[in-house]
Amino acid sequence: MTTMLKGIAASSGVAVAKAYLLVQPDLSFETKTIADTANEEARLDAALATSQSELQLIKDKAVTTLGEEAASVFDAHMMVLADPDMTAQIKAVINDKKVNAESALKEVTDMFIGIFEGMTDNAYMQERAADIKDVTKRVLAHLLGVKLPSPALIDEEVIIVAEDLTPSDTAQLDKKFVKAFVTNIGGRTSHSAIMARTLEIPAVLGTNNITELVSEGQLLAVSGLTGEVILDPSTEQQSEFHKAGEAYAAQKAEWAALKDAETVTADGRHYELAANIGTPKDVEGVNDNGAEAIGLYRTEFLYMDAQDFPTEDDQYEAYKAVLEGMNGKPVVVRTMDIGGDKTLPYFDLPKEMNPFLGWRALRISLSTAGDGMFRTQLRALLRASVHGQLRIMFPMVALVTEFRAAKKIYDEEKAKLIAEGVPVADGIEVGIMIEIPAAAMLADQFAKEVDFFSIGTNDLIQYTMAADRMNEQVSYLYQPYNPSILRLINNVIKAAHAEGKWAGMCGEMAGDQTAVPLLMGMGLDEFSMSATSVLQTRSLMKRLDSKKMEELSSKALSECATMEEVIALVEEYTK
């Protein structure tokens, strides 16, 4: 029987394929007394060998998607599997206690995990504990004969169904086989959504319970355009979805013709369309989609994909590659934004009641613990500045004094490099992200000291509305077009322009087709979005009149009380 679910349309596109459930299996087992210890040893050896082969395959695929350094985590996992001491201890438990391989494996690995986790002053050993946990799950799954999901090993067309997708999950996805994904939780601004748009994979998020309704291999039809997911679609419904997919492909072909065109409105006004990236590999997509700049380079992925703090030289090479890849076009680099939901296995973050409101981003950089990291990153950026048009911005700034402190460290490192005879570019612009309401309200004072603003709407909206963007129960409060949000944004843009500075936006709102006309009217200078949204936004801007959009935004700011009123007004002015 056909069932239809409605979720959040998070990444455009249409797909019809079999479901691949990316859910953790039940790995519970009973401890059994056994007589044939040789057979248990053989079962263990077979599970270890199969796990080793799987991890090698996963690593080989991860090298192509993540790069050699990031994929090295799988080397650590394979070293655990190949550890003769651990294997010998597991076999000793099998023989001494006459228990099944599952029980012996758990006893020995739990012992090692406990020892390593107890070394609180040794980040390397704590990281090994995490490796053992991951490897134990894989070996246990093979002993129990249950499937452990491995996205990297998918070799047929599927639609991923999951509670949510982690950065490591999405990094393993092969677009050739993964045609879409659907999750229980998440929204348009969640990591899963952003990655889906970057990879150009259709996605529907926030369905609440799809993992409970779908079985492995069940046929699904997914529309990232409407947010619809159909379980067991009829032949007629499959045909409708295929037609919708063809229509969307034709639309994309029309947009592709604008790749080398200027972003100019119907009345001749130019706006800068930029793209957001997470790794140097993303630059190719930026250029393929005709972006005029990079408005946000999320450098924290350099840290998250490494096994230890990236060195100054490692970072220099990454920043150099991005700047050279953009051939002189502007690149805005955000200094590391660690904390919140972005953790590092080799850097201890405190357990906090509200990590998104806690010790993160620039707050870490300005601390004693983060000072060395921050200076290393700034030195690498300054060294790379000679390879392109670099702009630097600091995230999570609430106070003018925070910006001054960060700028002071920047100036100190710049002076040191120059004294060492290291070339540094002239005229590097240094700005801040506006993502905290306090900074948005005080934009007029910040504008006197910074070179530019980049509005980070993903956090600005959730902080202003006091609504966790990942919490489905309060998702109705996450309103990009709420008049309160629009007034904050307008305040920031006007404050920048009053001091002769420029204002950009790097949140997902910058590529939102309802928000773009409003932002044009407010005078936003740079729109930075997922690279795959650039051409669609250029197409929209080319048919709009900037003067008319000024009327629209003025009316929305002065007359609208609700998000619904704003949306209706945009529809009236853009139809």
Curated annotation (Swiss-Prot):
<feature type="active site" description="Tele-phosphohistidine intermediate">
    <location>
        <position position="191"/>
    </location>
</feature>
<dbReference type="Pfam" id="PF00391">
    <property type="entry name" value="PEP-utilizers"/>
</dbReference>
<dbReference type="GO" id="GO:0005737">
    <property type="term" value="C:cytoplasm"/>
</dbReference>
<dbReference type="Pfam" id="PF05524">
    <property type="entry name" value="PEP-utilisers_N"/>
</dbReference>
<keyword id="KW-0418">Kinase</keyword>
<dbReference type="InterPro" id="IPR018274">
    <property type="entry name" value="PEP_util_AS"/>
</dbReference>
<protein>
    <recommendedName>
        <fullName>Phosphoenolpyruvate-protein phosphotransferase</fullName>
        <ecNumber>2.7.3.9</ecNumber>
    </recommendedName>
</protein>
<feature type="binding site">
    <location>
        <position position="459"/>
    </location>
    <ligand>
        <name>Mg(2+)</name>
    </ligand>
</feature>
<feature type="binding site">
    <location>
        <begin position="458"/>
        <end position="459"/>
    </location>
    <ligand>
        <name>phosphoenolpyruvate</name>
    </ligand>
</feature>
<dbReference type="GO" id="GO:0016301">
    <property type="term" value="F:kinase activity"/>
</dbReference>
<feature type="active site" description="Proton donor">
    <location>
        <position position="506"/>
    </location>
</feature>
<dbReference type="InterPro" id="IPR036637">
    <property type="entry name" value="Phosphohistidine_dom_sf"/>
</dbReference>
<dbReference type="InterPro" id="IPR000121">
    <property type="entry name" value="PEP_util_C"/>
</dbReference>
<dbReference type="Pfam" id="PF02896">
    <property type="entry name" value="PEP-utilizers_C"/>
</dbReference>
<dbReference type="InterPro" id="IPR023151">
    <property type="entry name" value="PEP_util_CS"/>
</dbReference>
<dbReference type="InterPro" id="IPR024692">
    <property type="entry name" value="PTS_EI"/>
</dbReference>
<keyword id="KW-0808">Transferase</keyword>
<keyword id="KW-0598">Phosphotransferase system</keyword>
<dbReference type="InterPro" id="IPR015813">
    <property type="entry name" value="Pyrv/PenolPyrv_kinase-like_dom"/>
</dbReference>
<comment type="function">
    <text>General (non sugar-specific) component of the phosphoenolpyruvate-dependent sugar phosphotransferase system (sugar PTS). This major carbohydrate active-transport system catalyzes the phosphorylation of incoming sugar substrates concomitantly with their translocation across the cell membrane. Enzyme I transfers the phosphoryl group from phosphoenolpyruvate (PEP) to the phosphoryl carrier protein (HPr).</text>
</comment>
<dbReference type="InterPro" id="IPR040442">
    <property type="entry name" value="Pyrv_kinase-like_dom_sf"/>
</dbReference>
<keyword id="KW-0813">Transport</keyword>
<dbReference type="GO" id="GO:0009401">
    <property type="term" value="P:phosphoenolpyruvate-dependent sugar phosphotransferase system"/>
</dbReference>
<feature type="binding site">
    <location>
        <position position="469"/>
    </location>
    <ligand>
        <name>phosphoenolpyruvate</name>
    </ligand>
</feature>
<dbReference type="InterPro" id="IPR050499">
    <property type="entry name" value="PEP-utilizing_PTS_enzyme"/>
</dbReference>
<keyword id="KW-0460">Magnesium</keyword>
<dbReference type="InterPro" id="IPR008731">
    <property type="entry name" value="PTS_EIN"/>
</dbReference>
<dbReference type="InterPro" id="IPR008279">
    <property type="entry name" value="PEP-util_enz_mobile_dom"/>
</dbReference>
<comment type="similarity">
    <text>Belongs to the PEP-utilizing enzyme family.</text>
</comment>
<comment type="subunit">
    <text>Homodimer.</text>
</comment>
<keyword id="KW-0479">Metal-binding</keyword>
<keyword id="KW-0963">Cytoplasm</keyword>
<keyword id="KW-0762">Sugar transport</keyword>
<dbReference type="GO" id="GO:0008965">
    <property type="term" value="F:phosphoenolpyruvate-protein phosphotransferase activity"/>
</dbReference>
<dbReference type="GO" id="GO:0046872">
    <property type="term" value="F:metal ion binding"/>
</dbReference>
<dbReference type="InterPro" id="IPR006318">
    <property type="entry name" value="PTS_EI-like"/>
</dbReference>
<feature type="binding site">
    <location>
        <position position="435"/>
    </location>
    <ligand>
        <name>Mg(2+)</name>
    </ligand>
</feature>
<feature type="binding site">
    <location>
        <position position="334"/>
    </location>
    <ligand>
        <name>phosphoenolpyruvate</name>
    </ligand>
</feature>
<feature type="binding site">
    <location>
        <position position="298"/>
    </location>
    <ligand>
        <name>phosphoenolpyruvate</name>
    </ligand>
</feature>
<dbReference type="InterPro" id="IPR036618">
    <property type="entry name" value="PtsI_HPr-bd_sf"/>
</dbReference>
